[in-house]
Amino acid sequence: MNVQIQYVKFDADTKLVEFVEHKMDKLDRFVERAIGADVILKLDKDHELGNKVATINLHIPGDDLVAESRGKSFEEAVDLSIEALKRQIDKYKGRLEK
């Protein structure tokens, strides 16, 4: 799966990039038909809810699955987005089986 990672309003370190790539590799094993994914990591102004935002747009044939989560760290936000995508993938697989 081709994964494009974008950073908005900050420069990512190597550790964060490797973390995101590792998580996306795990997600790729979960869904067989994924074409690619766009991961957008950005800083937001809202510190109460968490100012780190991770948006993942997963491209699959005929559909796009999108999850956006906030956290106090980018790792937390990415984990929450991945979990949301896993739930969406389960629903998508259920629709395909009908």
Name what the model sees in each region.
Residues 1-98:
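N-terminal, polar/charged subdomain of small-to-medium soluble alpha/beta proteins
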